[in-house]
Amino acid sequence: MVTIANAHDELIHDAVLDYYGKRLATCSSDKTIKIFEVEGTENYQLTETLVGHEGPVWQVAWAHPKFGSILASCSYDGKVLVWKESPDRSWSIISEHKVHQASVNSVSWAPHELGAVLLCTSSDGRVSVVDFNDDGTSTHIIFEAHKIGVNSASWAPVDTKSPVRRFVTGGSDNLAKVWSLDASKSTYVEEAKLEGHTDWVRDVCWSPSALVRSYIATASQDRTVLIWHQDGEGKWQKQKLTEELFPDVCWRCSWSFSGNILAVSGGDNKVSLWKENLQGKWESAGEVDQ
């Protein structure tokens, strides 16, 4: 584990490596985003500080490199900013998305096969999906997803046979919901409502690989993580990651690239790793003290 000292002046909310693992973007309550060059396993060199938000920055997301060196950020200020690196290695804002009326809590780029598409969730209860066109213009769809606030969202992996836009959202109504695009109505429709938590759903994560079975993980303030999969009839079934409650709130969950390991971070400042055994039960695969 590598510690980067004095990266920000206040609490860091997110840290994400780019596609190649060569750069790290971090964001903080100090309203800034910082870009680090990664050299080897322990050398992180600060190369840029991005200033543009007027409140705490909750999350950052790198676009696929086919679209260039592009980073999206979201903030308590209700804005989503899209940043691009120019050939001289300077960064600038190329798009500002201001359709939400409250904090924007998460941003997530769609699988690159679907184009340059950004998914945003907000405390105003709505989700917006922004399509960025080759000519520099953009269009968006916005709709209500969870009345008292949306905390997170995650795209489904692309089915090459039927590349439908699908994603899952997690809300302050204790629910997760699965959505898909209805192109005829130019909006997203609710496919399924995933009920199982007794407090806010803080994070959702759709496994990136559907080679064997597609999973959704939901992490909640109720100190549980649920794993969801569709049965033969297409109905979503849930399974507790562990029968015991986590020591504190479960803030984030994240699948490995191959989708066979799940990482869970909680209010106890620990990251636990989980994997499915041959009997279909989830078991501990280790723990990291932060």
Curated annotation (Swiss-Prot):
It comes from the Eukaryota. It is a peripheral membrane protein. WD repeats lie at residues 7-46, 52-93, 99-140, 145-189, 196-238, 245-284. It is found in: Cytoplasmic vesicle, COPII-coated vesicle membrane; Endoplasmic reticulum membrane; Nucleus, Nuclear pore complex. Keywords: Cytoplasmic vesicle, Endoplasmic reticulum, ER-Golgi transport, Membrane, mRNA transport, Nuclear pore complex, Nucleus, Protein transport, Repeat, Translocation, Transport, WD repeat. One of its GO terms (biological process) is protein exit from endoplasmic reticulum. GO terms for molecular function: structural molecule activity. Belongs to the WD repeat SEC13 family. The COPII coat is composed of at least 5 proteins: the SEC23/24 complex, the SEC13/31 complex, and the protein SAR1. Component of the nuclear pore complex (NPC). NPC constitutes the exclusive means of nucleocytoplasmic transport. NPCs allow the passive diffusion of ions and small molecules and the active, nuclear transport receptor-mediated bidirectional transport of macromolecules such as proteins, RNAs, ribonucleoparticles (RNPs), and ribosomal subunits across the nuclear envelope. Due to its 8-fold rotational symmetry, all subunits are present with 8 copies or multiples thereof. This is Protein transport protein SEC13. It comes from Meyerozyma guilliermondii (strain ATCC 6260 / CBS 566 / DSM 6381 / JCM 1539 / NBRC 10279 / NRRL Y-324). The gene is SEC13.
